[in-house]
Curated annotation (Swiss-Prot):
Forms a cylinder of 14 subunits composed of two heptameric rings stacked back-to-back. Interacts with the co-chaperonin GroES. Belongs to the chaperonin (HSP60) family. GO terms for molecular function: ATP binding; ATP-dependent protein folding chaperone; isomerase activity; unfolded protein binding. Keywords: ATP-binding, Chaperone, Cytoplasm, Isomerase, Nucleotide-binding. Its EC number is 5.6.1.7. It catalyses: ATP + H2O + a folded polypeptide = ADP + phosphate + an unfolded polypeptide. ATP binds at T30, L31, G32, P33, D87, G88, T89, T90, T91, G415, N480, A481, A482, D496. Together with its co-chaperonin GroES, plays an essential role in assisting protein folding. The GroEL-GroES system forms a nano-cage that allows encapsulation of the non-native substrate proteins and provides a physical environment optimized to promote and accelerate protein folding. Gene3D superfamilies: GroEL, GroEL-like equatorial domain, TCP-1-like chaperonin intermediate domain. GO terms for cellular component: cytoplasm. This is Chaperonin GroEL 2. It is found in: Cytoplasm. It comes from Albidiferax ferrireducens (strain ATCC BAA-621 / DSM 15236 / T118). The lineage of its organism: Bacteria, Pseudomonadati, Pseudomonadota, Betaproteobacteria, Burkholderiales.
């Protein structure tokens, strides 16, 4: 076992503070409509220009092991917020940084870290409740466009494009993003659907950047039951390999041996493939698999219709222009099904709806019909260079996540104002001890920081603008850093998804509480460097 280095108490907290501070300073510059970009060195190719807090955070690794612990813990805030909300990573980092610095000052004054933590938890619960009161539903297409534009670094064209996509496929519809071939981003709606099932093994991932499996011109095997053996499928698999097509397997269950065989073929490059579970449960699962069969022009392997695995031919497989599979969803784009058959299937589903006896059944049938009718909105991102394309694609993805969050939990005034207004819930709140009350005050002070950071990045004086905004009784009154004007932020289109704001706050408080309760850091001791000019036996340089 390698020897370890240990540091305690004030020394440990000082190292944590330095690491947290270093990462936060790099991430904070990207916040707001006038936030700066960051250039990241890459091992291969040209440097990457980004305006995304989570990408900046992920790229940072500090030389000092103890300082790096602080940086990595703060990075966890950005990563967790990105995973849960898809946006708000920089806000979460700014909040966590402020809470940690404020908390370390209290600890230096001799306060109890556990009481501080309890105070932070009390404050967060009160602020989250206040945010719910401040939020309102995201009702119009214009508001969706505003949310998307703000998330895309104030790019109105991205906002309009996403609003148009949601108009065409519905708020629950599937939206996919891919590289375009021109200078301008375009929207296209194609036959396809999305369902809530992801890959059965991460070894199927072939797009590391998006953590997804992407299969182009894909053949689709649909099984109503359990896929328990690939022996019967070997002749079919050999034909698929000869054609050079990837294979997507959708089945009720895939046993371990079959899954292992598919994974091994993928790793070896013999057959590009992916396996997912069929959507739904019971009879609804059978119906949804049949929906996919109609959409893709395939047949379902089922004992009921007399089609077994040993009898499956290439012509029985469904087809799609592309399949995108993530940990949670599968999106089929450009299904090869006949338009007439798809329309007939939709008509059948609507007749079933008329006969349905419960609201739940009617809702599920409506959902199935909408997925077949709506298709998939395909946003083809255009740019002049590859570097610009990657940066723009990241912004479109951020904007898509933000719009989903806005539809889910509503919207609040943006620009850091919602957190400032929610701070009013803490004005009269106290804990059972002085240290708990200090934890509440710590959160209250930190809620100012996103607004201060946005204003600072815009080149203005944070304290002056903070006081002006805080004095107004209007909850929507704030400062628009893009135009450098005051007014009703909701009317100006400066809005944030309530879910993103809430998760940023909760994740920041979670990591800050953990760090403030830390009393010891343990890291592997660096290996001593060999003395310069050292030689092996007999004065000769050793051979390796």
């Amino acid at each position: 076992m390698n020897p370890k280095q240990l540091i305690f108490h004030d020394d440990a907290r000082d190292k944590i503070r330095r690491g947290v501070d270093t990462l936060a300073q790099a991430v904070k510059v990207t916040l707001g409509p006038r936030g700066r970009t960051v250039i990241l060195e890459r091992d291969f190719g040209s440097p990457q220009i980004v305006n995304s807090g989570v990408l900046v955070a992920k790229s940072i690794e500090l030389e000092d092991r103890f300082e790096n612990m602080g940086a990595q813990l703060l990075r966890e805030v950005a990563a967790r917020t990105s995973e849960m909300a898809g946006d708000g990573t920089t806000t979460a980092t700014v909040l966590a940084h402020s809470m940690i610095l404020e908390g370390l000052r209290y600890l230096a004054g001799g306060m109890n870290p556990m009481d501080l933590k309890r105070g932070i938890e009390i404050a967060i619960d009160a602020v989250v409740a206040e945010l719910k009161q401040l939020s309102r539903p995201c009702a119009s297409s214009q508001e969706i466009a505003h949310v998307a534009a703000i998330s895309a670094n104030n790019d109105r064209s991205i906002g309009d494009l996403l609003a148009s996509a949601i108009d065409k496929v519905g708020r629950e519809g599937a939206i996919s993003i891919e590289d375009g071939s021109g200078l301008v981003s375009v929207l296209d709606v194609v036959e396809g659907l999305q369902f809530d099932r992801g890959f059965l093994s991460p070894y199927f991932i072939n797009n590391a950047e998006r953590q997804s499996a992407v299969l182009e011109d894909v053949a689709i095997l649909l099984c109503e039951g359990r896929l328990s053996s690939l022996k019967d499928l070997l002749p079919l698999l050999e034909e698929i390999v000869k054609e050079g097509r990837p294979l997507l397997v959708i089945a009720e269950e895939v046993d371990n041996d079959s899954l292992a065989a598919l994974v091994i073929n993928t790793i070896r490059g013999t057959l590009k493939t992916c396996a997912v579970k069929a959507p739904g449960f019971g009879d609804r699962r059978k119906a949804m698999v049949q929906d996919i069969a109609v959409l893709t022009g395939g047949s379902v392997v089922s004992d009921e219709v007399g089609l077994t695995l040993g009898k499956v031919k290439l012509s029985d497989l469904g087809r799609a222009t592309r399949a995108e599979i993530t940990k949670e969803t599968t999106t089929l784009i450009g299904g090869a099904g006949q338009p007439k058959a798809i329309k007939e299937r939709i008509a059948t589903i609507r007749k079933e709806r008329e006969l349905a006896s419960s609201d739940y059944d009617r809702d599920k049938l409506d959902e199935r019909a909408a997925k077949l009718a709506g298709g998939v909105a395909l946003i083809k991102v255009g740019a002049a260079t590859e570097t610009e394309l990657k940066e723009r694609k990241i912004r479109v993805e951020d904007a898509l996540h933000a719009t989903r969050a806005a539809v889910e939990e509503g919207i609040v005034p943006g620009g850091g104002v919602a957190l400032l207004r929610a701070r009013r819930a803490l004005l009269t709140l106290t804990g059972s001890t002085l240290d708990e009350t200090s934890g509440i005050r710590l959160v209250a002070r930190s809620l100012e920081e996103p607004l201060r950071c946005i204003v600072s990045n815009a080149g203005d004086e944070p304290s002056v603008i903070l006081n002006r905004v805080d004095e107004s009784p209007d909850p929507a009154f704030g400062y628009n850093a893009a135009t450098r004007t005051y007014g009703d932020l909701l009317q100006m289109g400066v809005i944030d998804p309530a879910k993103v704001t809430r998760l940023a706050l909760q994740n920041a408080a979670s990591i800050a509480s953990l760090i403030l309760g830390t009393a010891c850091l343990i890291a592997t001791a660096p290996k001593p460097l060999p003395e310069e000019g050292a030689h092996g036996p007999g004065g000769e340089t050793p051979m390796f």
